[in-house]
Amino acid sequence: MQHEAHTHGINMSALGRDKQSLSLEQETVAIEVPGLSLYYGEKQALFDVSMNIPKQRVTAFIGPSGCGKSTLLRTFNRMNDLVDGCRVEGAINLYGNNIYRKGEDVAELRRRVGMVFQKPNPFPKTIYENVVYGLRIQGINKKRVLDEAVEWALKGAALWDEVKDRLHDSALGLSGGQQQRLVIARTIAVEPEVLLLDEPCSALDPISTLKVEELIYELKSKFTIVIVTHNMQQAARVSDYTAFMYMGKLVEFGDTDTLFTNPAKKQTEDYITGRYG
């Protein structure tokens, strides 16, 4: 059954997305989730979620508020460890290694798997010091190395041309959209393998949102990206693959064009056509 007529104006014009047909089975796996459940105390928030996140692609998580998409995202760098009473059952394998095994270096994991949150959170420091923050923590202090990293990361975050003449000004003087791109620069400066974006545009105006979306497309040549978004138009524009979640369960996961135009599950169709959520 075709559902093209029911996408309710969702713009499927991807940001330069490769037009060849995508297939999860043919992708290199970056993150393997072989049956994950998560509890906050007695309350179960994720129910036996299984999926493979492909390397150097953009994967979007969509679903109504409270469906578990941000909770799942935060398992990928163990941010949920910071929540009292949080308990995970199952494994998450990052390039074949279980990140929940005993003795895992969580600080190193969070360097390898960087995260950007909804609200831009630059530090009250200069633009330069924001970008090199993680490098300094690693003990890197040689000026030439830091200078090169700042230019590389700001260019990577499409911010260099806007700030190159004021690197020693406060980051708090930047616009919201610039601050979010600075946070992305700070995150990629330590050269992670995976970027987690938790509704990164929800606090931004449309023009800033477009810049961040274009940036996401550029960054996937270097990083595996997973984005949580409440905006289905955004998921359709920026992602290669989309996962639809509902009440802590993974309902459907596949290439974005197919999921939005010809979903396999009625629950998915009902959500993307606005019947609920």
UniProtKB/Swiss-Prot annotation:
Q: Which UniProt keywords apply?
A: ATP-binding, Cell inner membrane, Cell membrane, Membrane, Nucleotide-binding, Phosphate transport, Translocase, Transport
Matches recorded under Gene3D superfamilies: P-loop containing nucleotide triphosphate hydrolases
Chain sites annotated for binding ATP: 63-70
In terms of superkingdom, the source organism counts as: Bacteria
Query: What molecular functions are annotated in GO for this chain?
Result: ATP binding; ATP hydrolysis activity; ATPase-coupled phosphate ion transmembrane transporter activity
A Gene Ontology BP annotation from the UniProt entry: phosphate ion transmembrane transport
Subcellular location(s) per record = Cell inner membrane
Q: Which Pfam families match?
A: ABC_tran (PF00005)
Domain (ABC transporter): give its ranges: 31-272
For this protein, the record's InterPro entries field holds:
AAA+_ATPase, ABC_transporter-like_ATP-bd, ABC_transporter-like_CS, P-loop_NTPase, PstB-like
Q: Give the record's subunit note.
A: The complex is composed of two ATP-binding proteins (PstB), two transmembrane proteins (PstC and PstA) and a solute-binding protein (PstS).
User: What protein name is recorded for this chain?
Assistant: Phosphate import ATP-binding protein PstB
- Which species does the entry assign this protein to? Pseudomonas fluorescens (strain ATCC BAA-477 / NRRL B-23932 / Pf-5)
Q: Which gene encodes it?
A: pstB
